[in-house]
């Protein structure tokens, strides 16, 4: 006898999912720790009805992204690569040059790398808003403050 008949996939209906807005202050916090806290909220792993194939997570606003810290010598040695898809089109930036040019990019790249690849990951990434300083235009939302280590 096959006892696998009771395994059912749980599907949450979107009308029952209420999305909250969480704000994380990234000043003087380690980049990877901020990214993992944001991922937990974006994926919905903090909710009892988490399913990995649905967007059940909440929205995350990260402020003061330009004041995030790195451990060790990564400020000078961490290299970010991108390619233009043309022959010889490999570009590289250190953390220092990238954060001077676009202060929110290192945090966005770290979070995007932790999300699932594919349509669900792109949908979850749209629920993230990163701001270089404390000024943001989302004050009309009911923001819940989240303390990250």
Swiss-Prot record:
One of its GO terms (molecular function) is mRNA binding. InterPro entries: Ribosomal_uL13, Ribosomal_uL13_bac-type, Ribosomal_uL13_CS, Ribosomal_uL13_sf. GO terms for biological process: negative regulation of translation; translation. Keywords: Ribonucleoprotein, Ribosomal protein. It holds the Pfam family Ribosomal_L13. It comes from the Bacteria. One of its GO terms (cellular component) is cytosolic large ribosomal subunit. Coiled coil: none annotated. Part of the 50S ribosomal subunit. HAMAP family: Ribosomal_uL13 (MF_01366). This protein is one of the early assembly proteins of the 50S ribosomal subunit, although it is not seen to bind rRNA by itself. It is important during the early stages of 50S assembly. PANTHER family: LARGE RIBOSOMAL SUBUNIT PROTEIN UL13M (PTHR11545:SF2), RIBOSOMAL PROTEIN L13 (PTHR11545). Belongs to the universal ribosomal protein uL13 family. This is Large ribosomal subunit protein uL13. It comes from Borrelia recurrentis (strain A1).
């Amino acid at each position: 006898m096959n006892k696998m008949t009771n395994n059912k996939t749980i599907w949450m209906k979107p009308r029952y999912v209420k999305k909250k807005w969480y704000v994380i202050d990234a000043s003087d916090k380690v980049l990877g720790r901020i990214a993992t806290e944001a991922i937990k909220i974006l994926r919905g792993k903090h909710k009892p009805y988490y399913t990995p194939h649905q967007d059940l997570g909440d929205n995350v606003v990260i402020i003061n992204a330009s004041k995030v810290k790195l451990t060790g010598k990564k400020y000078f040695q961490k290299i970010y690569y991108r390619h233009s898809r043309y022959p010889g089109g490999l570009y590289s930036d250190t953390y220092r040059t990238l954060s001077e040019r676009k202060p929110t990019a290192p945090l966005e790249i770290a979070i995007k790398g932790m999300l699932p690849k594919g349509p669900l990951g792109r949908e979850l990434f749209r629920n993230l808003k990163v701001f270089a300083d404390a000024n943001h235009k989302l004050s009309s939302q009911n923001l819940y403050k989240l303390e990250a280590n």
